[in-house]
Amino acid sequence: MRRASGVLRVLGGLTQRCSTSSTPSSSRFPAMNSRRKRNSVRKTATIEDIVEPRKVKHVTQTAAGMGEWIGSLDNTNIHMSLDEFMRRPMVRQLAKENGINDKLFMRSFKSFREYCTPEDLNSVDPGLLILLSDISKGTKDCEMLYPFFLDHAKQVFPHLEAMDDLRIISDLTRPHNWYPEARSVTRKIFFHAGPTNSGKTYHALKRFGEAKSAVFCGPLKLLAAEVFHRTNELGIPCDLVTGEERRFAKDNHHPSQHLSSTVEMLSTQMRVEVAVIDEIQMLRDEQRGWAWTRALLGAAADEIHLCGEPAAIDIVKKLLEPIGETVEVRYYERKSPLAIADKAIESYSNIEPGDCIVCFSKRSIFFNSKKLEENGIKPAVIYGDLPPGTKLAQAAKFNDPDDECNVLVATDAIGMGLNLNIRRVIFNSCTRQTELLPTYAALQIAGRAGRFGTAYANGVATTMRKEDLGTLKAILSEKIEPIANVGIAPTYDQIETFSFHLPQASFVRLLDLFVSVCSVSDHFFICTVYDMRELAVLIDQIPLPLKVRYTFCTSPLNTEDKRTSAVFVKMARRFSTGQALTYEWLIDMLEWPPKPATTLNELSLLEQNYEILDQYMWLSMRFPDMLPDEPRVREASKHLDSMIQEGVESFMSLLSVGATESKAAGSSKSSEGKRENPSKSEREKPNKRSSILEALLKRADISEDDLEQLREELNKNKK
């Protein structure tokens, strides 16, 4: 067993056919969301670093008239006795047995000494005074102070009183016991293993359609919606559940036997014949891996069909071993070949129909789109900030052989969830977050090249720059390491029970404390949730019930955007007053009606407004009485989606007007490399750049090889 070192991901949600967990990132953010890459850094803070000491008040009754008992006792005598007490090895040993390590001991001792030596000794507990007097006279040993010290330490650090209970509550080593419904079923597990474009999901979905009742769990809202539409088109009634939306094949009084959902929204109480869990390798994801682990262990189905990379096979078997479930693996080969080109593109004049330039920031999207336009090529554009409707519209334009947009510029948002007829995937860079792309991510992106049954059946992967091609070949040639451990998160009930023992702790403090004491087995890690904690800090001073605060803090909100964060705080504050969050109140903050985008900044503003409306719909799913105008907000959201589509259609004119508007190229919800699109704060962080050249690397479109060449040239000039 080991102590968890991440920041927990805990989510709450819906009842009935919806999951009891929320879905903060299922529908809009791709798995490789680099905005959150910073979250993958494991937290190392211990409970001793987190807890704050409480001031212990002196007794209200005084020790007046005790002169005959304490004699000439004064603060000097007391200091001598306490110093001797502190140095005793036995005292330290007893403290450790009661959960007081050296750090807590010194903090507790400092408070204890201050308590024992006030200006007026009459305010000290009489029993303690008598003992201190006896110790100073030599008739009692200083170690007899320990019971008083321990009692004081527990008042200074209340968690010490409940430490054993807190460890029991935060024990996450046996998550399979959390799902009694699933444990009551004799489940058959099928693993459909293969690369992109191998037909693994197709075969699993065939079984989904054949079953009398079934649930599909996808990684993205777009994919869940696609399964929803296709299933209904086949004449099989199917409902849809995502974090922001519920749709019924008939109506809410007649739920269908088939359900398509984002993976976070799976209800572990829903009994079905077949459950399909797509992209099972997402178990490894730092942010969302907990949802796949929960689905794997908690889906109450006779048959579980897993689809994903072979790298997940071993860990899936290990996770199911304690409950006696075995896995039948079915391997699939890629239906069309994927080749690595011998040459890089190098020039935009070499771009051809069916090409997709993959970037890792909005800045690079804008840069490459403008270069293509200068070469007479009108591209389709897809990046993470775009609403689903706009993404689908851009994908449709690119896929349409009669449309002039036969080239695509996209972030790695294309890695999953969109059907695209791509011939060549062109990597604009091989780095993301200033680090080389991991093999599994590069293969996921490269695998989008070539699509069985289309004009581009044979796929090709290459790079924009000649110097990156060797790097790409090396990355893609590496074997994907088997997944060693998977994400896990505690339940809301665990957090709530934890809070009962620490009633004075803020929600932020509860999160930190839970992580510092919880335990997980070697097959698991606690999913990080930097954004959840940031949201908790934003509304820390707003009075909200724990469940409400908890749900607000699991919202799928971009915490790096000050405007959306400010609206989030206003929503929480109005909620706390008991006032309904109405449509009129909401649009009043958004300067409604919106104006068509004529610059990149204005397009970015429309995207922010869309995210705010999306946030409203997400909260409305959980608090329909307090956010009653979901239908009107959804209509407004559709209107914004259309306006954003129009803005993207006139993308090139926006670029010409706003090419210098660097703010519009801010953080995107898709994976954005810091090298391609660093924020101002990142550029200014101390100790993060060792030279001006490395600063240029972060600000401009310069590769690592370019940087090395610059160094060599400067060295020659010096000589």
From Swiss-Prot:
Residues 16-42, 662-692 are annotated as: Disordered. PROSITE patterns: HELICASE_ATP_BIND_1 (PS51192), HELICASE_CTER (PS51194). Residues 671-687 have a biased composition (Basic and acidic residues). Gene3D superfamilies: 1.10.1740.140, 1.20.272.40, 1.20.58.1080, P-loop containing nucleotide triphosphate hydrolases (3.40.50.300). One of its GO terms (cellular component) is mitochondrial matrix. SUPFAM superfamilies: P-loop containing nucleoside triphosphate hydrolases. Its main location: mitochondrion. GO terms for molecular function: ATP binding; ATP hydrolysis activity; DNA binding; DNA helicase activity; RNA helicase activity. InterPro entries: DEXQc_SUV3, Helicase_ATP-bd, Helicase_C-like, P-loop_NTPase, RNA-DNA_Helicase, SUV3_C, Suv3_C_1, Suv3_DEXQc. Residues 343-499 form the Helicase C-terminal domain. Residues 181-319 form the Helicase ATP-binding domain. The keyword Transit peptide applies. Its cofactor is Mg(2+); Mn(2+). ATP binds at G194, P195, T196, N197, S198, G199, K200, T201. Residues 693-717 form a coiled coil. One of its GO terms (biological process) is mitochondrial RNA 3'-end processing. It is found in: Mitochondrion matrix; Nucleus. Residues 1-18 form a transit peptide. It catalyses: ATP + H2O = ADP + phosphate + H(+). ATPase and DNA/RNA helicase able to unwind DNA/DNA, DNA/RNA and RNA/RNA duplexes in the 5'-3' direction. This is ATP-dependent RNA helicase SUV3 homolog, mitochondrial.
